[in-house]
A protein has these predicted regions:
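Aromatic "clamp/platform" in nucleotide-sugar-dependent glycosyltransferases that forms part
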Residues: 307
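Carbohydrate-associated surface elements
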Residues: 182, 205
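Conserved acidic donor-binding segment of nucleotide-sugar-dependent glycosyltransferases
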Residues: 339-340, 344-351, 360-366
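Short alpha-helical donor nucleotide-sugar binding micro-motif in glycosyltransferases
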Residues: 170, 286-287, 294-299
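Nucleotide-activated donor-binding/catalytic signature segment of Leloir-type glycosyltransferases, i.e.
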Residues: 269-287
């Protein structure tokens, strides 16, 4: 079966879970054509992402004249479908902060994608994220292209669900996917009750084969913590220097490694200096998947101080690497992190509670940390094997294709 995947920006370092899902579908024998509106080749550091770039069709590279021509052609040859798509784009644009003009651009993008899906013989479109990628997928369907489904991740979609017309997108789709039960509950808030059966839970996943049996915990030196993610307001990294300083004031010996980059890097560096913890912090920048696994192997635990989340891939990766997780008790985190079993949960935004858990982790014997890591590894392998989750997605697509 030939299907299309549609994203706004792909590939990029923060959506490696999409790549893993696509590859898992291809291992099942499916042919997947990648569409993205754009991608930044210069920003890619992982060789696997570079390879994906070469396999991805970038819609905006077609240029404005070609997109406009595709829209005009469909307006003339499929006037009823074009009228439906135009009405949807106008309606959605009226709700959105991006406005109706931007949605006319989405309509032109959809016309181009509809033409390409027909030329490629694609029978279904799956969009990731409930943002403009799902909008374009819905418009492609209106224009006479294949049916569509989409995956909602959060937290961004849940910040502006009405502006994104999430309820309308669920109603128009063959099915909608949430990556956690928390995500499904949030999507259900904006979908009509009659459409709730369309909303299914399929987890993002890891490739178990890439995570061999964990090595031993670091035997000497301070408690080694690592945090991984984009330096953005929702990830809460600004809280870490304060919590680190509090823990050190109590005599806790620890070191923190921050993996990632982003718009808040300067503020994070300033907070590190302000709290006097520069000697206990390492910033690595972005690392590829192999680099992330090396950092996890050199740590005792992952810390994730997020203010908003979906269901973080870094939690899955840390657990697969046999490392306990300190995470905020928000969104999908409690679906993975079991307090006292696979890690610890902390109220979001509470630096003092974070410092308490740093002290708790530092006082926990290495053998117990390793035991918690093994429990986490078993849990994530059972719940987040990407081949198993992709097979569930494939069955939903197959069901959607039945008359």
């Amino acid at each position: 079966m030939r299907i299309g995947y549609l994203l706004n920006t792909y590939p990029q370092s923060s959506v490696t879970f999409v790549r893993r899902e696509i590859h898992a579908l291809e291992r099942l024998g499916w042919q997947v054509h990648r569409f993205a509106m754009r991608s930044d080749r210069a920003a890619l550091v992982d060789p696997a992402d570079v390879a994906e770039y070469d396999r991805t069709e970038l819609v905006l590279q077609a240029g404005a004249p070609r997109l406009a021509k595709a829209a005009l052609r469909l307006a003339l040859t499929r006037p009823h479908g074009f009228a439906r798509a135009l009405a949807r784009a106008w309606r959605m644009g009226g709700r959105s902060a991006q406005g109706r003009l931007r949605h006319m651009i989405y309509l032109a993008e959809a016309a181009h994608v509809a033409h390409r899906t027909e030329a490629l013989g694609l029978v279904h479109l799956h969009a990731h994220f409930g943002t403009n990628s799902a909008t374009v997928a819905a418009l492609v369907q209106d224009l006479g292209g294949p049916g569509f489904s989409f995956t909602v991740h959060g937290p961004e979609e849940f910040d502006s669900p009405q502006a994104l017309s999430l309820g309308e997108k669920v109603a128009a789709s063959a099915f909608a996917v949430a990556i956690s039960w928390h995500g499904r509950s949030q999507l259900s808030r904006w979908a009509a009750y009659a459409d709730w059966p369309r909303i299914r839970v399929i987890h993002c996943g890891i490739e178990p084969g890439r995570f061999p049996e964990p090595g031993p915990m670091p035997a000497e030196g301070p408690l080694r913590l690592v945090t991984i993610g984009r330096f953005a307001e929702q990830k809460g990294q600004l809280l870490l220097p304060e919590a680190l300083a509090m823990a050190r004031a109590r005599g806790v010996d620890l070191h923190l490694t921050l993996v990632g980059d982003g718009p808040m890097r300067a503020e994070i560096e300033a907070a590190i200096a302000r709290h006097g913890v520069a000697d206990a912090v390492t910033l690595t920048g972005w690392l590829d998947e192999a680099g992330v696994r090396r950092v996890l192997a050199d740590s005792h635990a992952l810390v994730l101080p997020s203010f908003a989340e979906g269901l973080p891939m870094v939690v899955m990766e840390a657990m697969a690497a046999g490392r306990p997780v300190i995470a905020t008790a928000i969104a999908g985190n409690p679906e993975l992190v079991l307090p006292g079993e696979t890690g610890w949960l902390v109220p979001a935004g509470d630096a003092e509670a974070l410092a308490d858990l740093f002290a708790t982790a530092a006082a926990t014997p290495a053998a117990r940390l390793a035991e918690m890591g093994r429990a986490g590894r078993a849990r994530v392998m059972q719940r987040h094997d990407i081949d198993r989750e992709a097979a569930r997605l494939a069955r939903l697509i197959e069901e959607a294709m039945r008359p």
